[in-house]
Structures are given as structure tokens and as C-alpha cells.
Amino acid sequence: MKPTRRALLSAGGASALALSLAACSKSQPKTAQTQASGTPIAEPVLNDKQLSEILQRVQTGLATADKEKNADKLKEVMSGPAARIRAAEYATASASGNNDFIHPMTTTIQGGGVGQTVGFPRNAAAASEGASPSLISLEQNSARDQFKVWAWVQGFSEKKNIPVLTKQSAQRAKQVTADSTGLVSTPKAALDAYVDALNHPDGENGKAFPDDLLRQKVQAARTTNLSSLGEVTVTATAGKDGFQGLQMEEGDGGALVFTTLTYTVVYKRTVDGSDLTLQGDVAALMGGNQKIVGTVTATYDSMVAFSIPKEGSKDKVAVLGAETALIKVDRDDSKTLAPTASASAKPS
């Protein structure tokens, strides 16, 4: 699995994101050098060989955990939202008997990049091969820890339309924060705008972002047909996991940013005596009773990747991909009524 030295180009006219392995040293990382003043010099945290070896280790460990649907084994190769969302996929797959809820993540990379820092945590990113590439964010929390997958997403479009690696255009990258500057938007503002687009699809932000697969999934949930016997409310909120990614200091100067969001789908019975039954992934986590007596609330977590162009660019923030899983289902049976009408609904 030999990574190439090419840059990540985002979709929708967003600026080139230089995830170039030229940002990695050709040799083993050295101890931090210092300037004449004694201030440590930020250096690449990995070289290309090490990044490939890390991703090979991740693929092997993930294959074992996936086969057994063993969330404990994920701790060896995943952390943060990646581990939480993969564990949720295992739970839904086990409850439903359908392994399709465990979505593939490919680590054979086309290209990648690493942050330059003197401290921890340390970040790296990679884009996989394939028609629908995985975009992966890696994190090392301390010198004693292994690099682990902190987040990953599946590209929203085919390879020809979104992240493709075509050329080398940057030598340095700094790690992003929620308030990173030098971009058309801070990462936090980009996430807030996208969450607003999910909540208000006809609003200003709703019109600014393309109709991607996550937006379609949220809208499909919002329009679930309960046959006039109930109502559905969908609400998205920014996640609490923070932000990771790389901001290029040369070339186009854009940033690749990973973060999370949460959305809840509340199914409420509104007609006294009606009988509403849920199907699909939500029903699988409801145990033996799939009926809506009062309300049923499904909570989903999504990892999301953004391309944020350099400040002054005419390009806009683009959403590159997402990975979503059903985290939990809560029910409130405070009103128990005798059924007189019936309907069933399958969440999208």
C-alpha cells in the first residue's frame, strides 16, 4: 500500500486541499528542533512509510472487530466519534441481523497529509482509493499512544466528482481548531451553517449547501408517513467532539476539517386510539415492542468532513462526506391508549 504524492481536490468548486505526503519527512521523524531562541520548531509528525503502516494496522484491527462486532477491539484502532459510531453500527447490525449497517472503510490510500506540531494531540489525514473514497482523520493523543482513527466519512459522490488526488501543491500543514483563521469560514461557523441547513432546508444556509446524501436522509426522516395518525420532528445540533483536520500553508491554502453533528427524530402519536408501528433500524433497537404509544426518539450521530477554502477565495465551504449511525432509541409511553386505527412506518 504505497501512498502517492498528490493533493486532495474538493467537490463543488472548493479549493484544492493539499494532502500531500510531501508534508511528511522522507526519514524517521526527528526530535523537535529548536530555533536560535530555543523555541521548538514544528515538524511533520509522520513520514509516508509510517502513515502507510498505521493505516495497514488500522485495516487489520478493524477487520477483526467487524467480523466479531466487538466494540472493545475497536479501542486498538479507533477513538472518539469513530469508535462510538462504529460501535453503534455493530449494535444495530446485531439487533437487526443485518450487517449492511456496518459500513465499509477503506484504508488503501491515494494520498494523505500530516500536521506539523511540537505537542499533542497529533493529527493526520488520508483519502482512500476507490469510486467512493473514504476520508480518514487520525489522532495520536500522547507519545505513548498509537495513532487511531478519530473520524472517517464516505464521499458523497463518485471519485470523478469529489476528493480526487491529482497533484502536489503544498509542503506544510497546520492542525485546525474550531476557530482557525485564514479561511472563508472558521470550522465552527461552517458546522453551524450546515446544521442550520439541516434544520431549515428552505433557509439561506439551506440554499447555500448542495442537496447531499446526509441532507436527503434527514429530509426523508422528516417526511416519514404516519398516515395522519402522528407527526415527526427532526432536529439537528452541532456535535461535542470538537474539530480535527489540516490547514495548508502553501498552494491553495484551504483546510480539510472533520467534526460531528447529532440529529434526533421524534415520532409522536397524535390520534387517540391509533396504532403506530415502526420498522427498520429504529424498530430493531426497540426490542419486542415497536409500537409508538406516546413518543419514540431516535438519536443519530454523524461524522462530517468539510472543505473550507482559503480566505479571499471565491469558492464556498463544501461538505465532502459523512458517516451516520443510529446511537440510541428512547421511548415515552406516558399515554397508553387502546388502538382503534393502525399504520406502520419505516424510518429512512
Feature names for model-found ranges:
Residues S25-S27:
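Bacterial signal peptide processing site
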Residues L21-A23:
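C-terminal motif of bacterial Sec signal peptides marking the signal peptidase cleavage site
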Residues A91-L135, V234-L278:
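Surface-exposed, charged secondary-structure patches
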Residues R5-L9:
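N-terminal export leaders
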Residues D272-G294:
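Mixed-charge, low-complexity intrinsically disordered segments
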Residues A131-A189, E250, G254-F258, Q290-A345:
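Short beta-strand edge/turn micro-motifs at domain boundaries
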Residues G13-A18:
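Bacterial N-terminal signal peptides
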Residues I41-A93, L165-T233:
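Core segments of small alpha/beta cavity-forming domains
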